[in-house]
């Protein structure tokens, strides 16, 4: 939020037009599969025919927004947003637990024979998110007329297929 504060300060002090977007778990073709985000790890596992090994109980809830939808939202905010305002960009219709996401991704590519493996997470040292649910309030950007179009199955299928074509 420090960047947002600096931008709004420039708006107020120098009248520099500023609009702020807050992307929520945006994914799609071209994303780095080694960036440490759980869904990037899951995609890399499927692309490389590896089982998905859960590093937590998978109960954290997240909403995912396909890159093409997010890009349209970014431009809409740039062109029609109010200076100094922040707009959440996400897909509140695509909220899913991390465990259910792993199972869903595996089910999209049954021919790969990949499965979800759960560990006993009682004694495991993993970075646990302090946020158990992260679903954006989309009211402000919806008021600009933006609604994401891509469902989670379609978006992740396209994303994984894009990496399959590269390999």
Where are the language model's segments positioned?
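Short, function-defining helix-loop hinge/capping sites that tune catalysis or transport
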Residues: 8, 30-33, 98, 145
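C-terminal substrate-binding subdomain of Rossmann-fold SDR/epimerase-dehydratase oxidoreductases
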Residues: 46-167
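Flexible, glycine-rich beta-alpha linker
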Residues: 16-37
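Active-site Tyr-X1-5-Lys
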Residues: 1-22, 43-48
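Residues in and immediately flanking transmembrane alpha helices
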Residues: 13, 35-38, 79, 164
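Short-chain dehydrogenase/reductase
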Residues: 1-4, 36-40, 63-64, 95
